[in-house]
């Protein structure tokens, strides 16, 4: 006789995972989902197996707002090998060229300055970007090259931490859709020596503090020590789901207007932002219940609402 299945939970919140080296983002997601016994879970932008660092995992109703974290700014620490270019632009690929490195700090800083600010970037063939429903890396592994359009990106800050004639270490604060491996590959070509990513760590997503990250091993230890039938210690690590949209202006509504929004109706509001997405709360308790949009001054329309108000 088989073991009885353990029912999942309707648990809402966001856990900031410190992704370990060598594990795919989806593998980590499934492990976390099982640990929390969550009915629904989703991550907010994959990290390569080579990469480590912050991977927000949304549970339950928080998955409705994961796109806003996918669209958020990111901060990375990267170590690049100079003098060697690979077909994947990272250490997991095949070496395609080896060249001598002739470099001084003035020339390096001048090359780095090229990447600061607004620019356009052609995504790597070894990225998870989809083409006809399939990630580009699937085509690349079959030797197929797909034409990709350059996309606008913004590097808000790029700091040189240390360098020598074999490697360079950078910290990069950038917009969504920025491929660090492409920056490193382009940097290597600009320097004339080639380069690839040796190590990559995501330090931040949006404004989430690095101090709130937790490792998979820590979650597993907490779950192993937890009393039977309670996950309170794990749940205490969850951030509220509205933290995903904390940068949006807040609109607090009385219960009657909140009820109308839940029915899909547009409501009139005063003394609110003129336009754009807003974070919605209800009543004196300020319970979060989703996001809306002010498409015209004084008119609020529902966009993504949770199933019911959560405390």
UniProtKB/Swiss-Prot annotation:
Pfam families: TruB-C_2, TruB_C_2, TruB_N. The keyword Isomerase applies. Substrate binds at residues 43, 76, 179, 200. It catalyses: uridine(55) in tRNA = pseudouridine(55) in tRNA. Its EC number is 5.4.99.25. GO terms for molecular function: RNA binding; tRNA pseudouridine(55) synthase activity. InterPro entries: PsdUridine_synth_cat_dom_sf, PsdUridine_synth_N, PUA-like_sf, PUA_sf, tRNA_psdUridine_synth_TruB, tRNA_sdUridine_synth_fam1_C, TruB_C. Keywords: Isomerase, tRNA processing. One of its GO terms (biological process) is tRNA pseudouridine synthesis. It is an enzyme of class 5 (isomerase). Gene3D superfamilies: Pseudouridine synthase, PUA domain. Coiled coil: none annotated. It comes from the Bacteria. The active site is at residue 48. Belongs to the pseudouridine synthase TruB family. Type 1 subfamily. HAMAP family: TruB_bact (MF_01080). Responsible for synthesis of pseudouridine from uracil-55 in the psi GC loop of transfer RNAs. This is tRNA pseudouridine synthase B.
């Amino acid at each position: 006789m088989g073991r009885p299945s353990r029912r999942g939970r309707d648990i809402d919140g966001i856990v900031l995972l410190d992704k370990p080296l060598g594990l795919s983002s989806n593998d980590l997601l499934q492990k976390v989902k099982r640990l929390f016994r969550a009915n629904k879970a989703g991550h907010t932008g994959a990290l390569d197996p080579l990469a480590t660092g912050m991977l927000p995992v949304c549970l339950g109703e928080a998955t409705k707002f994961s796109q806003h974290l996918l669209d958020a700014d990111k901060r990375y620490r990267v170590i690049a090998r100079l003098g060697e270019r690979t077909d994947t632009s990272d250490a997991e690929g095949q070496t395609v060229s080896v060249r001598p490195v002739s470099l001084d700090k003035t020339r390096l800083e001048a090359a780095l300055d090229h990447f600061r600010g607004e620019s356009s970037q052609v995504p790597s063939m070894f990225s998870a970007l989809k083409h006809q429903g399939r990630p580009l890396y699937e085509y690349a592994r079959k030797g197929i090259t797909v034409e990709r359009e350059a996309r606008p990106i913004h590097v808000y800050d790029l700091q040189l931490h240390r360098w020598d004639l074999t490697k360079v270490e950078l910290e990069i604060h950038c917009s969504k859709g920025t491929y660090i491996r492409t920056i490193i590959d382009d940097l290597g070509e600009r320097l004339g020596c080639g380069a690839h990513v040796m190590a990559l760590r995501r330090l931040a997503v949006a404004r989430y503090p690095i101090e709130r990250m937790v490792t998979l091993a820590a979650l597993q230890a907490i779950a192993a020590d937890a009393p039977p039938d309670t996950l309170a210690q794990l749940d205490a690590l969850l951030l509220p789901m509205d933290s995903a949209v904390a940068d949006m202006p807040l609109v607090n509504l009385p219960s009657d207007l909140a009820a109308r929004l839940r029915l899909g109706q547009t409501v009139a509001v005063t003394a609110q932002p003129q336009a754009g997405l807003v974070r919605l709360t209800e009543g004196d308790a300020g319970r979060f219940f989703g996001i809306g949009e002010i498409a015209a001054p004084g008119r609020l329309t529902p966009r993504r609402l949770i199933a019911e108000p959560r405390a």
